[in-house]
From Swiss-Prot:
Quaternary structure (record): The basal body constitutes a major portion of the flagellar organelle and consists of four rings (L,P,S, and M) mounted on a central rod. The rod consists of about 26 subunits of FlgG in the distal portion, and FlgB, FlgC and FlgF are thought to build up the proximal portion of the rod with about 6 subunits each.
Location in or out of the cell: Bacterial flagellum basal body
InterPro entries referenced in this protein's UniProt entry, alphabetically: Flag_bb_rod_N, Flagellar_basal_body_rod_CS, Flagellar_FlgE/F/G, Flg_bb/hook_C_dom, FlgE/F/G-like, FlgG_G_neg, LlgE_F_G-like_D1
Name of the gene encoding the protein in the UniProt record: flgG
Record's protein name: Flagellar basal-body rod protein FlgG
GO cellular component, one term: bacterial-type flagellum basal body, distal rod
Taxonomic placement: Bacteria, Pseudomonadati, Pseudomonadota, Alphaproteobacteria, Caulobacterales
Key words, A-Z: Bacterial flagellum
Keyword Zinc: no
């Protein structure tokens, strides 16, 4: 019976939906996290009577036809890139991007990844790194005798050194933009890789046209909204239960048919 396969596809779709929602909820407090949504598409249709064909009885044109759908499939899981709320911190190396852009990160493999999680620190050599020790690109080193660190909205990094009244420039933070942010590949650790779908990265200083600005002493909070996610979770759960009910009903119909035949 087609209803069994159709309902099974609905249950599989809602299972994926719940998995996406649960990942959003799990990352409510993850710096720079962007929530995701699952989108679905209908499957092929069985055409019993084609619209516009002639009826076999009197030759009239069939106005709508008869088509029965075969279920649902996952079309995509897309990322919602709206801005998260800037959260004040006490670290001078914490950065939030206000607007579009990603900060380039050098991976141990030599690849360049990209992130919006600006909760940075320094390693034992004074280089600015992520929580996992990956270098921010281009590389910037904070001198050991630095007494104050200032990062401007345009990404200029300056430090004050012992015995020197004037600040010294030690680097310039850049941002990367992509034609299709949805095409970036998430690899965990708040990092993304460029793909053929995202297009090549375009680099520029923060504040340039089309690029966001930096906020020092801030990090960007996750854009997950708890109320919206719980509402979506309840909706997905109800849809799953209804598809399960369809399977139960179809099974009862099959049993009744079998009993009639026997």
């Amino acid at each position: 019976m087609q209803a069994l396969r159709t309902a099974a596809s609905g249950m599989a779709a809602q299972q994926l939906n719940v998995e996406v929602i649960s990942n959003n909820i799990a990352n409510m407090n993850t710096v720079g996290f962007k929530r995701q949504r699952a989108e679905f598409q209908d499957l092929l249709y069985q055409t019993i009577e084609r619209a516009g064909s002639q009826s076999s009885s009197d030759g009239n044109i069939v106005p709508t036809g008869v088509q029965v759908g075969g279920g649902v499939k996952a079309g995509s899981v897309y990322r919602i890139t709206e801005q998260g709320t800037p959260t004040l911190t006490d670290s001078p190396l914490d950065l939030a991007i206000q607007g579009k852009g990603y900060m380039p990160i050098l991976l141990p493999s030599g690849e360049t990844a990209y992130t919006r999680a600006g909760n940075f620190s320094t390693n034992d050599q004074g280089q600015i790194v992520t929580e996992d020790g990956y270098l921010v690109q281009p590389g910037i080193t904070i001198p050991q005798n630095a007494t104050d660190i200032t990062i401007s909205k345009s990404g200029l990094v300056q430090v004050k050194l012992d015995g020197q009244p004037q600040p010294q420039t030690v680097g310039q933070i850049q941002l990367a933009n992509f034609l299709n942010e949805g095409g970036l590949e998430a690899i965990g650790d708040n990092l993304f890789l460029e793909t053929a779908a995202s297009g090549a990265a375009t680099l520029a200083a923060p504040g340039e046209p089309g690029f966001g600005m930096l906020l020092q002493h801030y990090t960007e909070a996750s854009n997950v909204d708890a109320v919206s996610e719980i509402t979506a979770l309840i909706t997905a759960q109800r849809a799953y239960e209804m598809n399960s009910k369809v399977i139960s009903t179809a099974d009862q119909m099959l049993q009744a048919t079998s009993q009639l035949r026997s």
